[in-house]
Swiss-Prot record:
Protein name per UniProt: Outer-membrane lipoprotein LolB
Pfam family, one: LolB
Source lineage: Bacteria, Pseudomonadati, Pseudomonadota, Gammaproteobacteria, Alteromonadales
Biological processes annotated in GO: lipoprotein localization to outer membrane; protein transport
Residue positions of covalent lipid attachment, annotated as S-diacylglycerol cysteine: 24
UniProt-listed NCBIfam families: lolB (TIGR00548)
Species of provenance: Shewanella amazonensis (strain ATCC BAA-1098 / SB2B)
UniProt xrefs under HAMAP family: LolB
First-listed, main subcellular location of the protein, grouped into a coarse class: membrane
Name of the gene this protein is made from: lolB
Compartment(s) of residence: Cell outer membrane
Membrane topology: Lipid-anchor
Signal peptide: 1-23
Keywords recorded for this protein, A-Z: Cell outer membrane, Chaperone, Lipoprotein, Membrane, Palmitate, Protein transport, Signal, Transport
Length: 207
Protein backbone atom coordinates (compact mmCIF):
# COMPACT_ATOMS: atom_id res chain seq x y z
CA UNK A 1 0.00 0.00 0.00
CA UNK A 2 1.23 3.47 -0.89
CA UNK A 3 1.22 5.69 2.18
CA UNK A 4 -0.68 8.95 1.59
CA UNK A 5 1.45 10.86 4.09
CA UNK A 6 4.64 9.91 2.22
CA UNK A 7 2.93 10.67 -1.10
CA UNK A 8 1.79 14.04 0.28
CA UNK A 9 5.30 15.02 1.33
CA UNK A 10 6.61 13.96 -2.07
CA UNK A 11 3.92 15.98 -3.82
CA UNK A 12 4.23 19.15 -1.75
CA UNK A 13 8.01 19.23 -1.31
CA UNK A 14 9.22 22.72 -2.09
CA UNK A 15 5.76 23.93 -3.11
CA UNK A 16 4.14 27.09 -1.82
CA UNK A 17 1.58 27.57 -4.59
CA UNK A 18 0.06 25.84 -7.58
CA UNK A 19 -0.14 26.87 -11.20
CA UNK A 20 -1.80 25.06 -14.08
CA UNK A 21 0.63 23.02 -16.15
CA UNK A 22 0.05 23.43 -19.87
CA UNK A 23 1.08 21.20 -22.73
CA UNK A 24 1.30 17.95 -20.77
CA UNK A 25 -1.13 16.02 -22.93
CA UNK A 26 -0.30 12.64 -24.40
CA UNK A 27 -0.67 11.51 -27.98
CA UNK A 28 -3.25 8.71 -28.23
CA UNK A 29 -2.93 5.96 -30.82
CA UNK A 30 -5.87 7.43 -32.76
CA UNK A 31 -5.41 11.06 -33.79
CA UNK A 32 -7.94 13.30 -32.07
CA UNK A 33 -9.11 16.80 -32.85
CA UNK A 34 -11.04 19.41 -30.81
CA UNK A 35 -14.77 19.56 -31.46
CA UNK A 36 -17.77 21.42 -30.09
CA UNK A 37 -20.62 19.52 -28.46
CA UNK A 38 -23.99 20.54 -27.08
CA UNK A 39 -23.63 18.42 -23.95
CA UNK A 40 -20.67 16.76 -22.25
CA UNK A 41 -22.37 13.40 -22.74
CA UNK A 42 -22.03 13.89 -26.52
CA UNK A 43 -18.22 13.80 -26.34
CA UNK A 44 -16.74 10.42 -27.23
CA UNK A 45 -13.41 11.61 -25.83
CA UNK A 46 -12.15 14.62 -23.87
CA UNK A 47 -9.21 16.11 -22.07
CA UNK A 48 -9.29 18.14 -18.88
CA UNK A 49 -6.81 20.44 -17.13
CA UNK A 50 -7.35 21.73 -13.64
CA UNK A 51 -6.39 21.45 -9.99
CA UNK A 52 -6.98 18.81 -7.35
CA UNK A 53 -6.95 18.93 -3.56
CA UNK A 54 -7.41 15.83 -1.38
CA UNK A 55 -7.81 16.03 2.40
CA UNK A 56 -7.88 12.88 4.52
CA UNK A 57 -7.08 12.21 8.17
CA UNK A 58 -4.98 15.34 8.55
CA UNK A 59 -3.09 14.80 5.29
CA UNK A 60 -3.39 17.02 2.23
CA UNK A 61 -2.43 16.47 -1.40
CA UNK A 62 -2.51 19.37 -3.87
CA UNK A 63 -1.57 19.01 -7.51
CA UNK A 64 -2.25 20.07 -11.06
CA UNK A 65 -4.51 17.63 -12.86
CA UNK A 66 -4.45 16.47 -16.47
CA UNK A 67 -6.93 13.86 -17.66
CA UNK A 68 -7.29 12.37 -21.13
CA UNK A 69 -10.34 10.13 -21.47
CA UNK A 70 -11.11 8.14 -24.63
CA UNK A 71 -13.10 4.95 -25.28
CA UNK A 72 -9.92 2.87 -25.56
CA UNK A 73 -7.33 4.69 -23.46
CA UNK A 74 -7.15 7.01 -20.48
CA UNK A 75 -4.41 8.93 -18.75
CA UNK A 76 -4.65 10.73 -15.42
CA UNK A 77 -1.58 12.74 -14.44
CA UNK A 78 -0.87 14.78 -11.30
CA UNK A 79 2.01 17.23 -11.45
CA UNK A 80 3.74 19.69 -9.15
CA UNK A 81 4.10 23.42 -9.80
CA UNK A 82 7.43 22.75 -11.49
CA UNK A 83 5.90 20.20 -13.85
CA UNK A 84 7.22 17.11 -12.08
CA UNK A 85 4.90 14.15 -12.47
CA UNK A 86 4.00 12.81 -9.03
CA UNK A 87 1.33 10.34 -10.13
CA UNK A 88 0.55 8.83 -13.51
CA UNK A 89 -2.32 6.43 -14.10
CA UNK A 90 -2.73 4.97 -17.58
CA UNK A 91 -5.40 2.57 -18.73
CA UNK A 92 -6.20 0.61 -21.88
CA UNK A 93 -8.13 -2.52 -22.74
CA UNK A 94 -5.35 -4.69 -21.29
CA UNK A 95 -5.39 -3.12 -17.82
CA UNK A 96 -3.97 -0.20 -15.87
CA UNK A 97 -0.57 1.03 -14.72
CA UNK A 98 0.13 3.40 -11.83
CA UNK A 99 3.45 5.21 -11.50
CA UNK A 100 4.08 7.06 -8.23
CA UNK A 101 7.12 7.87 -6.10
CA UNK A 102 9.43 6.24 -8.65
CA UNK A 103 7.59 2.91 -8.58
CA UNK A 104 5.28 1.22 -11.05
CA UNK A 105 2.24 -0.91 -10.23
CA UNK A 106 -0.01 -2.82 -12.64
CA UNK A 107 -3.45 -4.35 -12.32
CA UNK A 108 -6.40 -5.17 -14.51
CA UNK A 109 -8.42 -2.69 -12.43
CA UNK A 110 -7.44 1.00 -12.10
CA UNK A 111 -9.71 1.18 -9.07
CA UNK A 112 -7.65 -1.39 -7.18
CA UNK A 113 -4.47 0.49 -8.02
CA UNK A 114 -5.79 3.77 -6.62
CA UNK A 115 -7.29 2.03 -3.60
CA UNK A 116 -3.73 1.18 -2.65
CA UNK A 117 -2.85 4.87 -2.49
CA UNK A 118 -4.47 5.38 0.89
CA UNK A 119 -7.17 4.18 3.22
CA UNK A 120 -9.93 5.81 1.16
CA UNK A 121 -11.34 4.95 -2.24
CA UNK A 122 -11.02 7.38 -5.12
CA UNK A 123 -14.03 6.62 -7.37
CA UNK A 124 -12.09 6.47 -10.62
CA UNK A 125 -14.92 4.84 -12.58
CA UNK A 126 -17.49 7.45 -11.54
CA UNK A 127 -15.26 10.54 -11.69
CA UNK A 128 -15.38 10.96 -15.51
CA UNK A 129 -19.16 11.30 -15.19
CA UNK A 130 -19.30 13.47 -12.07
CA UNK A 131 -16.51 15.79 -13.20
CA UNK A 132 -18.53 16.54 -16.34
CA UNK A 133 -21.79 16.98 -14.43
CA UNK A 134 -23.33 13.63 -15.31
CA UNK A 135 -24.99 11.50 -12.62
CA UNK A 136 -24.53 7.76 -12.89
CA UNK A 137 -27.39 5.28 -12.90
CA UNK A 138 -28.89 5.04 -9.43
CA UNK A 139 -27.42 8.32 -8.18
CA UNK A 140 -29.69 10.70 -6.27
CA UNK A 141 -29.68 14.16 -7.85
CA UNK A 142 -30.74 17.64 -6.74
CA UNK A 143 -30.96 20.19 -9.56
CA UNK A 144 -30.38 23.94 -9.58
CA UNK A 145 -32.73 26.54 -11.08
CA UNK A 146 -31.25 25.90 -14.54
CA UNK A 147 -31.92 22.15 -14.22
CA UNK A 148 -28.23 21.34 -13.82
CA UNK A 149 -27.04 18.87 -11.19
CA UNK A 150 -26.27 20.74 -7.97
CA UNK A 151 -25.85 17.83 -5.57
CA UNK A 152 -25.25 14.20 -6.48
CA UNK A 153 -25.33 11.37 -3.96
CA UNK A 154 -23.78 8.17 -5.27
CA UNK A 155 -25.98 5.11 -5.58
CA UNK A 156 -24.15 3.41 -2.70
CA UNK A 157 -24.50 6.52 -0.52
CA UNK A 158 -20.76 6.78 0.07
CA UNK A 159 -20.07 9.95 -1.93
CA UNK A 160 -21.75 13.36 -1.99
CA UNK A 161 -20.81 15.62 -4.89
CA UNK A 162 -21.54 19.33 -4.63
CA UNK A 163 -21.17 21.38 -7.81
CA UNK A 164 -20.79 25.04 -6.83
CA UNK A 165 -20.18 26.63 -10.24
CA UNK A 166 -20.52 25.89 -13.94
CA UNK A 167 -18.87 27.12 -17.13
CA UNK A 168 -19.15 26.62 -20.88
CA UNK A 169 -16.31 24.68 -22.50
CA UNK A 170 -16.29 23.22 -26.03
CA UNK A 171 -19.84 24.53 -26.37
CA UNK A 172 -21.17 22.47 -23.45
CA UNK A 173 -21.98 23.34 -19.83
CA UNK A 174 -19.53 21.59 -17.49
CA UNK A 175 -18.79 22.03 -13.78
CA UNK A 176 -16.00 24.37 -12.80
CA UNK A 177 -15.84 23.72 -9.05
CA UNK A 178 -16.74 20.42 -7.39
CA UNK A 179 -16.38 19.05 -3.90
CA UNK A 180 -16.63 15.30 -3.32
CA UNK A 181 -17.19 14.24 0.27
CA UNK A 182 -16.61 10.75 1.68
CA UNK A 183 -16.41 9.52 5.25
CA UNK A 184 -12.63 9.27 4.86
CA UNK A 185 -11.82 12.12 2.47
CA UNK A 186 -12.78 15.43 0.89
CA UNK A 187 -11.74 16.02 -2.72
CA UNK A 188 -11.92 19.45 -4.33
CA UNK A 189 -11.67 19.72 -8.10
CA UNK A 190 -11.33 22.82 -10.24
CA UNK A 191 -11.68 22.47 -14.00
CA UNK A 192 -9.79 25.15 -15.90
CA UNK A 193 -10.07 23.62 -19.36
CA UNK A 194 -12.33 20.91 -20.74
CA UNK A 195 -12.02 20.04 -24.41
CA UNK A 196 -14.26 17.61 -26.27
CA UNK A 197 -12.36 15.47 -28.79
CA UNK A 198 -13.23 13.31 -31.77
CA UNK A 199 -11.34 11.14 -34.24
CA UNK A 200 -9.53 13.30 -36.77
CA UNK A 201 -10.95 11.05 -39.51
CA UNK A 202 -14.31 12.78 -39.30
CA UNK A 203 -16.22 11.77 -36.18
CA UNK A 204 -18.19 14.72 -34.80
CA UNK A 205 -17.94 13.64 -31.19
CA UNK A 206 -21.53 12.54 -30.69
CA UNK A 207 -22.27 9.07 -29.42
Amino acid sequence: MINLRRFTKFTLAGLTALSLLGGCSVTPKVALQPVSVENASDAKAWELKGKLLIRTNGDKVSANLFWLNTPDNAELRLTSMLGTTVLLLTQNRDGATLEVDGKRYSDLSPQRLLDGLSGFTLPIDALPFWITGQPMAGDEVEFDTLNRPKTIISADGEWTINISSWQTQSGAPVPRMLELTHASAVIKLQTNEWQALANATGSKGAR
